[in-house]
Amino acid sequence: MPPRGILKLALPTLCAYTIGITALHQELDCWSRWQLHTRFRGPYGKETLEFLCTIRDKVLDRAGLQPGEWVLDVGSGDGLLAFGALHRVFPGGLVILDDISQDLLDACTEVAHEAGVEEQLRCVRNDATDLSDVPDHSVDAVITRSVLLYVEDKAKAAAEFRRVLRPGGRVSLFEPISSAAINGHRFGIDPGPVAPLAARVEEAFRALQPAQTQAMLNFDERDLLRVFEEAGFTHLELELRASVKREHQSLAWFDALLNAPTNPRIPTMRQAISAALTPDEAATYLAYYRRAVAGGPIATRQAVAYLWGSVGE
């Protein structure tokens, strides 16, 4: 049986555990601040955690992990995939956590120490396109979740995944397809009479975003298949889940969308509103959307992709 510490970390997402042991007043980089303290605040934190655990399980199932294998988690973040993988490769296995955030790697190391599993983990600080601290043909599986959307050169990342895999090694990943929502209205609501104000808010939102965020919108599921095929992966499979839903939402849902960025590289909608509109205009803009939310239902669009495959023996 795996050590009790692994079971404790494999059941909930790591973030629910790290929030309790990470110093809240520590100066953190934007990635760790968002993953450990911002993302799960508000009324939908528990729902988000449950959603991420479902993703984790699907990614790990499709990686086909076995006891004794070595696994690389690229963009390991708060350790959601890594600690789940550790449970599956016990005994004798090893999980390598790779992230660009030293703060997140330190948080995961602290949790591993608390759980008594630090000997089964290693940490490296590399970009997904340059895994230079991971030797050629050294791991049995590469896993990743919501990482490639931040990477401009996705083909280079796929080539690095291929390089570090042993013959017969596997890849398994999850990515949101953000381009699927480009044609939808903000909040899923037609701006109607506040369309001129909404246009200014959208312009301000785009101006506040770093240039790198374009990487989130310039690919779809076909691009994922292409770059991994070109990198030398075989037996590739991809599952696309797309939905358009019209549901009644609460004002708490609307406030969460206003105040919490969906990733650490973009501003909040409230910041964009403040940058674009006068206080009176902002009040008019928000009052319109609040009435629309209260009247419901609201249309939401989402698309996500799971990709998995292997390299030749």
Per-range role (PLM):
Residues 16-69, 80-88, 103-107, 111, 172-201:
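Conserved class I S-adenosyl-L-methionine
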Residues 23-27, 31-43, 47, 235-297:
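C-terminal helical/coil "lid" or tail adjacent to the Rossmann-like core of SAM-dependent
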Residues 70-74, 78-131:
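Class I SAM-dependent methyltransferase SAM/SAH-binding core
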Residues 132-141:
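A short acidic, Gly/Pro-enriched loop at the edge of an enzyme's catalytic core
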Residues 140-154, 177:
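A short SAM/SAH-binding and catalytic strip from SAM-dependent methyltransferases
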Residues 155-170:
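A short glycine-rich, Lys/Arg-flanked "PGG" loop and its adjoining helix->strand segment in the class I
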Residues 216-231:
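Short alpha-helix
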